[in-house]
A protein has these predicted regions:
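Extracytoplasmic ligand/sensor domains, especially the bilobed periplasmic-binding protein
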Residues: 99-205, 254-281
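Solvent-exposed, acidic/polar segments of extracytosolic/periplasmic ligand-binding ectodomains
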Residues: 31, 350-419
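Extracytoplasmic "Venus flytrap"
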Residues: 31-55, 77-84, 106-107, 177-186, ...
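Short, low-complexity disordered leader/linker segments with a strong preference
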Residues: 1-32, 413-419
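Beta-alpha junction/loop-to-helix N-cap segments that form part of ligand/metal-binding clefts
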Residues: 32, 45-52, 65-137, 145, ...
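Extracellular/periplasmic periplasmic-binding protein-like sensory domains
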Residues: 147, 246-324, 335, 390-393, ...
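Signal peptide-proximal N-terminal region
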Residues: 26-28, 52-74, 165-169, 196-199
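Short, charged, surface-exposed loops that flank catalytic or proteolytic processing sites
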Residues: 335-347
Length: 419
């Protein structure tokens, strides 16, 4: 029988050692990780979820004694969802705040303006959900937390058109609708490429201004073209406006969706309710058994426990696991190299895989993932606006890829909507 006094003593020693390492870390200058984030403006509904994920990582690492024996500290500013604010923020982070590491806010349109600043200061920069942001620069110290693989633009719309091509009869025509902004331009480019590849004729192809609030004229114009499928690349706020307009006006088409940003977040689905039914869209992660990578559900539990008080998306299935994984990568790279030298960290990140709550990740040319892993989903049976119906996958089916598939597409769009 074990000596209970000895066991208690050992436990006390373990606690004291952990406390001692935390205190020792606090006595040293913090390692500063700097970024901008959409805390206000149209992208805040997603951006603030990323900030909570960053905070959870920061607290966990500091509780373990920090990095290199030093505490970590997040240094961030609200970019107000405005790309014009980004360069000034990153210049301040580097020149005034003297941050050690740079990460980004959410999305291509807010990441791209920061890259020239990082390049001019020769700093490592980690982009969060930025589609092919480095394709113009080929900057060796840029890394992407977005699972679209080494050819992200080519991959982005591929699954949507692959699904369409398998239907019987296959749709013959497509309308492409996109916001006039960098991410959506790339998504539309991908859609055009795969329309050609699958022999589907483009009968409508227009971009609308980012400040559009009335989408009725766009939906009427699309309907006039009579496309058998519609591919949309939009901002999160636009996604709500577009789908509400479709719900009010009606749209006769066999397949609808593609690149509706924000629809992956519970907060957006809660706004839309049944208007999301039938949509086939790109997604990145769902809590299905095949995607429960080690540690991810523990993180989700922590996130969801704090989400109500933080006033953010209640489920956190979209951006948060990837935001947390991004910092896991930096944590592992710093721990392995025992340095904050951005050049040495970049070399290590290009040559080693990383274990994260989003699975194993490795980086190739331009800092993109070596393996593409987007998923394609369809929403269905959504009733009302209660969040509980989105907590497990009962209102979403993973259609592709095969390794994550949970069911088949309901086709055409009218059938999926129960019409």
């Amino acid at each position: 029988m074990k000596n209970p006094t000895r066991a208690v003593s050992a436990a006390i020693v373990a606690v004291m050692l952990l406390w001692g390492s935390a205190v020792a870390a606090e006595d040293k200058a913090p390692i500063k990780i700097g970024f901008s984030m959409e805390l206000t403006g149209p992208f805040a509904v997603v951006g603030k979820t990323g900030l909570l994920a960053f905070k959870i990582w920061e607290e966990e690492v500091n509780a373990k004694g920090g990095l290199l024996g030093r505490p970590v500290k997040l240094v961030y500013y609200d970019d107000q969802s405005n790309p014009a604010n980004v360069p000034g923020i990153y210049t301040k982070l580097i020149d005034i705040d003297k941050v050690d590491l740079l990460i980004s806010s959410y999305g291509t349109n807010l990441v791209a303006p920061a890259i020239p600043v990082a390049i001019s200061h020769d700093r490592l920069f980690f982009g969060l959900f930025a589609l092919a942001a480095n394709e113009k620069f080929h900057y060796p110290k840029y890394f992407s937390m977005l699972p679209f693989g080494p050819e992200p633009v080519k991959t982005f719309a591929a699954g949507y058109f692959d699904l369409a091509a398998k239907q019987n009869p296959k749709p013959k025509t497509v309308a492409i609708v996109a916001t006039d902004a960098e991410f959506q331009h790339k998504a539309a480019e991908s859609a055009r490429e795969h329309a050609r590849r699958t022999g589907i004729k483009v009968v409508y192809d227009r971009a609308y201004p980012p400040n559009t609030v009335d989408f009725s004229p766009i939906i009427h114009a699309v309907q006039a073209a009579q496309p058998e499928m519609v591919y949309i690349a939009s901002y999160p706020s636009d996604t709500v406006g577009i789908l509400r307009a479709i719900g009010e006006i009606g749209l006769s088409t066999k397949m609808l969706g593609g690149g509706l940003a924000g629809l992956q977040a519970a907060a957006i689905k809660m706004q839309l309710g049944a208007a999301a039914n039938g949509i086939v869209n790109v997604d990145l992660w769902e809590p299905v058994p095949t995607m429960r990578f080690p540690g991810v559900m523990d993180f989700i539990k922590k996130y969801q426990a704090r989400a109500p008080a933080e006033g953010v998306d209640l489920l956190g299935y979209f951006l948060p696991p990837f935001a947390y994984s991004e910092l896991q990568v930096l944590e592992q790279a710093v721990a392995a190299t025992k340095t904050l030298d951005n050049g040495k960290l970049a070399e290590y990140m290009h040559s080693h895989p990383f274990q994260t709550i989003e699975g194993n990740i490795a980086f190739g040319p331009d800092g993109e993932w070596t393996e593409a892993r987007p998923i394609w989903v369809q929403y269905h049976d959504i009733k009302g606006h209660d969040v509980e119906q989105f907590r497990d996958p009962k209102t979403v089916t993973i259609l592709a890829p095969e390794k994550y598939k949970t069911g088949d597409v309901i086709y055409p769009y009218s059938k999926a909507r129960g019409e």
